[in-house]
Amino acid sequence: MSKVAEVLEIVKGLTVLELAELVKAFEEEFGVSAAAPVAVAAAPAAGAAAAEEEKTEFDVILTSAGDKKINVIKVVREITGLGLKEAKELVDGAPKPVKEKIAKEEAESIKAKLTEAGATVDVK
């Protein structure tokens, strides 16, 4: 059995506390650090970018009806299929979601229609 294989077998038999002691001993003996601060700092940024790329469902939030409330109610009815009363309640109760968990293209299209009607809209 080679030296490397022997050391590996010994390490396999160690407890977690013994492994922690071994790491400390290596750090002291060879003047190195087991921590990798550069890799740890870069990981969250990469993770955040991946999370943004993976987002496939969006919510269209009506934040304000603006001055042309009647036009906004008409567009909300067209988009949601709600009745007049329900659409008016949604518009009056802003900020409220108009549509949830939809594709980005559809969300942008709805935002454009509502903005054109005079509303203030967020896509999240």
From Swiss-Prot:
Function statement: Forms part of the ribosomal stalk which helps the ribosome interact with GTP-bound translation factors. Is thus essential for accurate translation.
UniProt keyword terms in alphabetical order: Ribonucleoprotein, Ribosomal protein
One cellular-component annotation, GO: cytosolic large ribosomal subunit
CDD domains per record: Ribosomal_L7_L12
Pfam families given in the database record: Ribosomal_L12, Ribosomal_L12_N
Organism annotation: Desulforamulus reducens (strain ATCC BAA-1160 / DSM 100696 / MI-1)
A GO biological-process term: translation
Molecular function terms, GO-annotated: mRNA binding; structural constituent of ribosome
Tagged with keyword Transmembrane helix: no
Quaternary structure and partners: Homodimer. Part of the ribosomal stalk of the 50S ribosomal subunit. Forms a multimeric L10(L12)X complex, where L10 forms an elongated spine to which 2 to 4 L12 dimers bind in a sequential fashion. Binds GTP-bound translation factors.
Protein name, entry field: Large ribosomal subunit protein bL12
UniProt family annotation: Belongs to the bacterial ribosomal protein bL12 family.
InterPro entries the record matches: Ribosomal_bL12, Ribosomal_bL12_C, Ribosomal_bL12_C/ClpS-like, Ribosomal_bL12_oligo, Ribosomal_bL12_oligo_N_sf
Domain of life (superkingdom): Bacteria
